[in-house]
Amino acid sequence: MQVLVGIVHVAAFFLGVFIVATTVMSAIKTFVLPRAANVRISRLVFVVVRVILDRIAPPSRAYADRDRVFAMQAPFSLIGLPGCWLLLIVVGFMLMYVGLGESPREAFITSGSSLLTLGFDKPPRFASISLSFIEAAIGLGLVALLISYLPTIYAAFSRRETPVAMLEALAGTPPSASSLLSRHHRIGGLERLDDLWITWRLWFADIEESHTSIAALIFFRSPDPDRSWITAAGCILDSASIYASCLDVPKSADCQLCIRGGYVALQRIADFFSYPYNRNPKPDDPISIDRSEFDDLWKELEEAGLPLRSDRDQAWRDFSGWRVNYDPVLLFLAGITAAPIAPWSSDRGWRYKPPPLLVTLGLRKPPQHPAT
């Protein structure tokens, strides 16, 4: 019997070590590691918060109501992350104290007292006292880590929102590709669009870096309820795709590089949620935009006096070939962020469906080629 008890204590101790080590690594990968990382705990927190808010404000509610609720998604997620980490730290050290011979009740009290630095419980053994010091240091470190990264988070948010706010003057509210191109044509600015493509290519590179290393930024909503970083991204990508495929203008390398930089950035952000999409789509794969919508856009551009190519059918094929690269991830990110309604992005009726738990925890790979 004593042998069995000893085995249980050893197993409990090493299970606690595993939980604590996993939790600490999760915190480091989430806030310190300067690259995208597959952090299961963080992804689970974001998905759970998203599901809860979706129950509070379902898609059937008015957008203004949903916007007020989802404005709290990022703050709740940021608060939920350290809360989840601290809970796991308590459980992990509790198991280690059990492994050192304390009863579960005593282990829980010791672990909670040490983590919160309350100091009302003194462990009976030197090994337990040493563990309590380590636990207190870890608890303070996790809280300090979150606080120290808040300025970094808000600096990245400010960089993201400046071009989004400026886009309203170019593309209207909600932003649309037809408005952006027509307005530039009226003021004689089509030949100066290369500057816009360069600006937004840099913007896409910035959000790829910031929104994959600090995933909470994905859910930070714009100060204006009618603006969204993802609908702005969709407007720019559609504008560049239409410019490259429909307008009778010289080819622009900056335009094409903007499209590629844009869809690569959105794909990297979608990867955080293990969203399945075809990484190598064919140009003729289906997209969420149908031919009649494209024809309506063509007529708008024609009435605005933009120089259009003579072959509309080929222009449609070229546009589809560009759009297919970012269509699924654009709709996914617009859905998961509950973005305001905007043409050809958040107006497609896409609804968020939480992935299976095993996929969320990274224990099973998602399918790679979903239907579009």
Protein language model regions, located:
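Transmembrane alpha-helical segments and their cytosolic interface motifs
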Residues: H9, V69-G92, G101, P225-A233
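Hydrophobic alpha-helical segments of integral membrane proteins
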Residues: I41-I56, F108-L115, G119, S130, ...
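Transmembrane alpha-helix/interfacial motif
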Residues: V8-R40
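Membrane-interface amphipathic/juxtamembrane segments adjacent to transmembrane helices
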Residues: F31-S60, R159-P175
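Soluble C-terminal extramembrane regulatory/interaction domains of multi-pass membrane proteins
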Residues: L196, I218-R221, P225-T372
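Pore domain of cation channels
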Residues: G16-T23, L78-T162, D238
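Non-transmembrane accessory domains of multi-pass membrane transporters/channels
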Residues: T162-A233, D238-S239, D248
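Cytosolic juxtamembrane amphipathic/interface segments immediately preceding
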Residues: L4, P58-S77
